[in-house]
């Protein structure tokens, strides 16, 4: 898998332990090298993609897409109704990338209590509410 140091740069060790214990962490390998990972968390009937990362050298090879599909399969296997994530609006390719995978932006008026909590935590980390958006997809969504 990815080195602890590489993973620590993104999620804290404690969060990592939690993700591992909840079975919500997958590491993608390419030619036996760690190439990316996805960390998920289950909230009631939904699966939240907390982070998805592909190392720069392994970009544009379908790894991110495969990791998202893995999370959607997990949600389906758990009988959950949806998968959601939060992403930066200003990164040009973000929204279209997730839309191709069946995600649609969620208006603030439709946020759940869990989404509100996630945003509050992000704000404590210094992330600006309006620069990011939630996107969600049905777990049953058939992806091409």
Which positions does each model-derived feature cover?
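Terminal substrate-recognition subdomain of acyl/acetyltransferases
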Residues: 86, 100, 104, 117-144
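Conserved GNAT acetyl-CoA-binding A-motif
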Residues: 75-88
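Conserved GNAT-fold acetyl-CoA-binding loop/helix
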Residues: 1-16
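Conserved acetyl-CoA-binding loop-helix of GNAT-fold acetyltransferases
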Residues: 54, 60-73, 99-100
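Conserved beta-strand in the GNAT
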Residues: 27, 33-41, 48-53
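A short, internal acetyl-CoA/4′-phosphopantetheine-binding micro-motif in the GNAT/acyltransferase core
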Residues: 29, 52-60, 87-88
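Short hydrophobic beta-strand segments in globular cytosolic domains
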Residues: 35, 105-106
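Conserved beta-strand-loop-alpha-helix junction that forms the acyl-donor binding cleft
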Residues: 85-94, 111-116
């Amino acid at each position: 898998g990815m080195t602890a140091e590489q993973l620590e740069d993104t999620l804290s060790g404690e969060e990592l332990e939690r993700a591992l214990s909840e079975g919500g962490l997958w590491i993608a390998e390419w030619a036996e090298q760690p190439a990316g990972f996805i960390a998920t968390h289950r909230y009631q009937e939904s699966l939240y993609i907390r982070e998805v990362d592909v190392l720069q050298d392994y970009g544009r090879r379908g790894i991110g897409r495969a990791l998202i599909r893995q999370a959607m399969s997990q949600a389906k296997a758990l009988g959950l109704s949806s998968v959601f994530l939060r992403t930066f609006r200003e990164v040009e390719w973000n929204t279209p990338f997730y839309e191709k995978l069946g995600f649609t932006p969620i208006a603030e008026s439709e946020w759940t209590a869990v989404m509100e909590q996630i945003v509050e935590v992000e704000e404590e980390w210094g992330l600006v509410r309006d620069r990011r958006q939630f996107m969600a997809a049905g777990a049953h969504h058939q992806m091409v």
